[in-house]
Amino acid sequence: MAEDEIWTEKYRPRRLEDVIGHQQITRRLISYVKSGNLPHLLFSGPPGVGKTACAVALARELYGETWHSNFIELNASDERGIDVVRNNIKNFARTAPLGEAKFKIIFLDEADALTSDAQSALRRTMERYAATCRFIISCNYSSKIIEPIQSRCAVYRFGPLNATDITTGITRIAKNEGLKIEKDGMDALIYVARGDMRRAINALQSAATIAKDITADVIYQTTSTAKPKEIEDMLKLALNGQFMDSRNKLDELLITYGLSGTDIIDQIYRSMFELGLDEDVLVALVDRIGEADFRLTEGASERIQIEALLAHFKMQGAARSK
Ligand SMILES: Nc1ncnc2c1ncn2[C@@H]1O[C@H](COP(=O)(O)OP(=O)(O)OP(=O)(O)O)[C@@H](O)[C@H]1O
């Protein structure tokens, strides 16, 4: 294998039993393989948790050697438009499946990026080729998929992977690549991954370019993530009434790590539960974080939103000490 190969590809599960986590889903997919038939499928869930990996492993097991000819992966949100996607489907569906197979599989990634009109066009395409093709539609949010498509599919919801799953995946790769992962290094990988195995593997590969001994410092440095402790320190300063100091800490984090506003908000959200705050204080702060998060997606100033959030930490801290 090439030295510079991307590890997420190199370690893509070949078989359904190699997929980590999602046992209930893989069990049912294996039963499709055994029966030699499957309905249209809708895979929904966050990025990097194994939706594509499951679809490819399913095709490999179903078709064996001929899987490449009987499986196509298309990006539904192809920027050239839904007509290009439909043309690709048409060309692929035109020829009969190879080998023993009764149907071909069309894997459509990012279907939730399609407008409702484009999804309606897709639905008609699904119907037209239903005799010779099965569709596996992948999306982050099933609520963004129109009802007529959802009702034609068996829906599988992929959740984020838990810490044990990430540890299993990372340990497997580290062993093969001759890396030593320190306990704090693994904790950092789990923190950075946020349930996304792709993110964990990419973080490991970047870290491996600078060290064979993977520590938390290496992970935070190579992924431009602030250490949870630094975020906690910033929040504690605000809670203790030292608003200007917490603001300086924010500056330091922005400069050191080049964090985006949404990165910091996400980290603040995760750190605040470690501060031993009363439930009613947490409730008030979570409410504010939700607000700031929404405003950022609407294009508000990152700097002002985060400072406003720190101001709320200060106000809650002051109310708490009364
Ligand atoms: N459950 C898993 N078990 C083992 N490896 C995994 C798992 N999930 C992800 N990976 C690794 O991460 C890579 C990316 O995963 P995959 O392409 O399946 O994500 P996805 O859920 O389809 O994401 P997206 O929504 O972004 O397309 C895989 O090639 C594999 O290396």
Curated annotation (Swiss-Prot):
Q: Function of this protein?
A: Part of the RFC clamp loader complex which loads the PCNA sliding clamp onto DNA.
Which key words are in the record? Answer: ATP-binding, DNA replication, Nucleotide-binding
Nucleotide-binding is among the record's keywords: yes
User: Molecular function terms in GO for this entry?
Assistant: ATP binding; ATP hydrolysis activity; DNA binding; DNA clamp loader activity
NCBIfam families from the xrefs?
A: PRK00440.1
The entry sums up its family as follows: Belongs to the activator 1 small subunits family. RfcS subfamily.
Q: Its GO biological process terms?
A: DNA repair; DNA-templated DNA replication
GO cellular component, as recorded: DNA replication factor C complex
Gene that specifies this protein: rfcS
Q: Which InterPro entries match?
A: AAA+_ATPase (IPR003593), ATPase_AAA_core (IPR003959), DNA_pol3_clamp-load_cplx_C (IPR008921), DNA_Rep/Repair_Clamp_Loader (IPR050238), P-loop_NTPase (IPR027417), Rep_factor-C_ssu_arc (IPR023748), Rep_factorC_C (IPR013748), RFC_lid (IPR047854)
How is this protein organized at the quaternary level?
Heteromultimer composed of small subunits (RfcS) and large subunits (RfcL).
Q: Which SUPFAM superfamilies match?
A: P-loop containing nucleoside triphosphate hydrolases, post-AAA+ oligomerization domain-like
Residues recorded as binding ATP, renumbered to this chain, are G45, P46, P47, G48, V49, G50, K51, T52
Q: Which domain of life is it from?
A: Archaea
Q: What is this protein called?
A: Replication factor C small subunit
Asked whether the UniProt record includes ATP-binding among its keywords, one would answer yes
